[in-house]
């Protein structure tokens, strides 16, 4: 069963809005079941690749079943690997082949013996030993382990037996022979302590020492030794990275953070179970209460239907809800308060947010976010429940205990809590952006008196340089977002000898709408960059084709809107969201046209530079351009390279190279004075730069 076009478009827009950072993504079917889990170095690049035409059979089947998309942004690709492994083992998706077995990423185990040893393992046991990891890259882990065993004289034997003579490792100076009693436990433990500090992240001294050795090896031209030391430094830095999605703390715990702007509040819940990030939920609602009341109400509402963990981490006071949690759970629920930096409130849908929290974020399908709140929970009933819980706890426990605050593991918990807070903040930012686009389209419908909301808008712009290299750009916006796969460019050669913006606009409109592909949907609105002259030219073509598509022109100088058959332009307030939407479309069309225009000019200048060389005509100039890409690359080439590129004798290649190296003509100019169409239909003056 093929998904509907509207569903595919919704998923594609979600993919386009994904961040260009590493993370994990989940495809779900119509029943909400996870059918595929993947990780990506760039979420946006990876997700948008699913909507291209060419795919292998497996991917085509996957996309035919996909109905929802969810993604989680991570700080490092390393964490994406760990989280992918956890989620695959949790959901066992149908279309995942690897990582579905019980095999996990390896750990480093430091035993608790009198003379401990360190080794790689895949099993975690409650045996008193210390475990570090997991580590997705086994090769880097083995490199790090070899470095440890080279640097510190730690035993590698499985069983420590008393011996009269040490083994070969002692003679290789790789072991202090504790089996012979030649090293005291105290001296041995000093090395173990240094290894522990290294695994806990105290790497500055070790890395500095290795960097000195590497530089000394480079000065002595011992490059192989320097490369090995470089790999050791890289292994240390990778191994000691602290993961926020997996740790060795097996306690069940929840991290709850929230972010708000105005009356809109989003809560993010991260669930850690067995030392792994086991789940993430986002809930959006509206509230005008203070911080303590907002969090208390959410905790009571959420944990009325969910299991209460023994440990809960929040970034603001939970108030009376702390007692209610312990009373409902029947056991002590420890609520730890860890203050965080607050996020700046998003002011506009397109505002850029700068935070002090770690750059580890999560994004979720908006369908999974409960926009209307968790449940219908009135203020009166909530406060009554809080007071009742407080009375019950006071009667059974006496005075209220203080909320636990700082601890030795607070930095790690604060980082996870900051991740939850960033999840909540990004949900609000995304919600405001989507709501802003909807409001702008509705306002646009109102101002232009359109029959329906213009969900599909196509914009045109003309760009040229004094009448040369004339191009027209066509860009498409769907639901207020760019639809880049439907962008088009037109090389307008019919008017390449004179400046005629109106004729260029007529040609672009005609070429777009004369022969439309099968299944093509006409836009709800056409926007042209220009004044009444450009609008009239476009309308003339639409009338000739028998198309009744709403048309509007946006002039740059006064930001006036020109409508066909309207005697006066429409002037909107500079703060009007409809005007902002049209400006965004106009500017995108302008950018797209300018980029193509510059490309044509640069290519022409390069071809002319090659044509000035001896034995080079137009055909050979294009071949040289395709092979070398620039005049500078040609100058640094060999005669053999030139002869091979354009199939000429070696003597001619020597002549071409000699002329190129002696050439004083600038092959490419990066700055140009660009004479484009004027927004009001007037020709630009000499030397005027209009982009």
Curated annotation (Swiss-Prot):
Record-level GO cellular component terms: cytoplasm; excinuclease repair complex
Domain of life assignment: Bacteria
Region feature Disordered, mapped onto this chain: 662-691
UniProt subcellular location: Cytoplasm
GIY-YIG domain: residues covered: 20-97
Stored SUPFAM superfamilies: C-terminal UvrC-binding domain of UvrB, GIY-YIG endonuclease, RuvA domain 2-like
Compositionally biased intervals (Basic and acidic residues): 668-680
Protein function: The UvrABC repair system catalyzes the recognition and processing of DNA lesions. UvrC both incises the 5' and 3' sides of the lesion. The N-terminal half is responsible for the 3' incision and the C-terminal half is responsible for the 5' incision.
Entry similarity comment: Belongs to the UvrC family.
Protein name (record): UvrABC system protein C
């Amino acid at each position: 069963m093929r998904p509907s076009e509207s569903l595919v478009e919704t998923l594609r827009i979600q993919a386009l809005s994904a961040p260009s950072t590493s993370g994990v993504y989940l495809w779900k079917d119509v029943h909400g079941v996870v059918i595929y889990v993947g990780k990506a170095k760039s979420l946006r690049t990876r997700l948008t690749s699913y909507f291209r035409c060419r795919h292998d059979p497996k991917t085509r089947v996957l996309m035919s079943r996909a109905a929802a998309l969810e993604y989680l942004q991570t700080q490092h690709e390393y964490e994406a690997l760990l989280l992918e492994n956890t989620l695959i083992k949790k959901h066992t998706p149908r279309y995942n082949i690897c990582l579905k077995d019980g095999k996990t990423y390896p750990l480093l185990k430091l035993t608790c013996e009198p003379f401990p040893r360190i080794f790689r393992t895949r099993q975690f046991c409650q045996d008193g030993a210390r475990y570090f990891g997991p580590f997705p890259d086994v090769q880097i882990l083995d490199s790090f382990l070899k470095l440890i065993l080279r640097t510190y004289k730690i035993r590698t034997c499985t069983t420590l037996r008393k011996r009269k003579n040490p083994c070969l490792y002692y003679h290789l100076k790789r072991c202090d022979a504790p089996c012979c009693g030649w090293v005291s436990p105290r001296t041995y433990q000093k090395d173990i302590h240094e290894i522990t500090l290294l695994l806990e992240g105290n790497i500055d001294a070790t890395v500095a020492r290795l960097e000195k050795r590497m530089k000394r090896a480079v000065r002595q031209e011992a490059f192989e030794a320097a490369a090995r030391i470089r790999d050791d430094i890289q292994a240390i830095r990778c191994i000691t990275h602290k993961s926020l999605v997996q740790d060795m703390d097996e306690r069940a715990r929840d991290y709850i953070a929230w972010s708000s702007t105005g009356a809109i509040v989003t809560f993010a819940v991260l669930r850690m179970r067995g030392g792994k990030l086991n789940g993430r939920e986002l809930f959006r609602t509206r509230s005008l209460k203070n911080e303590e009341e907002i969090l208390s109400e959410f905790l009571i509402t959420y944990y009325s239907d969910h299991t209460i963990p023994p440990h809960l981490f929040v970034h603001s006071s939970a108030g009376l809800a702390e007692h209610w949690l312990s009373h409902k759970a029947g056991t002590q629920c420890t609520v730890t308060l860890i203050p965080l930096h607050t996020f700046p409130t998003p002011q506009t849908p397109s505002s850029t947010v700068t935070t002090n929290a770690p750059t580890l974020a999560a994004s979720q399908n908006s369908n999974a976010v409960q926009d209307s709140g968790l449940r219908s929970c009135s203020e009166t009933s909530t406060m009554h429940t809080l007071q009742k819980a407080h009375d019950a706890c006071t009667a059974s426990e006496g005075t209220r205990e203080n909320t636990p605050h700082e601890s030795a593991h607070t930095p790690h918990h604060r980082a996870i809590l900051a991740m939850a807070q960033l999840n909540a903040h990004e949900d609000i930012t995304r919600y405001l952006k989507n709501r802003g686009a909807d409001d702008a389209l509705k306002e646009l419908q109102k101002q232009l008196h359109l029959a329906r909301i213009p969900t599909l808008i196509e914009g045109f712009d003309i760009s040229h340089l004094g009448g040369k290299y004339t191009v027209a750009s066509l860009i498409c916006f769907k639901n207020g977002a760019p639809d880049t796969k439907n962008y088009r460019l037109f090389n307008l050669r019919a008017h390449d000898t004179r400046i005629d913006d109106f004729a260029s606009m007529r040609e672009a409109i005609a070429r777009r709408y004369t022969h439309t592909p099968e299944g093509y949907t006409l836009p709800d609105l056409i926007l042209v960059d220009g004044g009444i002259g450009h609008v009239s030219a476009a309308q003339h073509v639409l009338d000739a084709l028998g198309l009744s598509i709403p048309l509007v022109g946006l002039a740059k100088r006064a930001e006036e809107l020109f409508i066909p058959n309207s005697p006066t332009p429409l002037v909107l307030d500079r703060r009007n969201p409809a005007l902002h939407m049209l400006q965004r479309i106009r500017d995108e069309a302008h950018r797209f046209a300018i980029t193509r225009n510059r490309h044509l000019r640069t290519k022409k200048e390069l071809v002319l530079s090659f044509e000035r060389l001896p034995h080079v005509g137009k055909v050979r100039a294009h071949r040289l351009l395709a092979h070398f890409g620039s005049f500078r690359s040609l100058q640094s080439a060999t005669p053999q390279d030139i002869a091979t590129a354009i199939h000429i004798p070696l003597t001619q290649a020597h002549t071409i190279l000699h002329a190129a190296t002696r050439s004083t003509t600038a092959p490419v100019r990066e700055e140009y004075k660009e004479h484009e169409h004027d927004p009001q239909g007037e020709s630009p003056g000499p030397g005027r730069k209009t982009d």
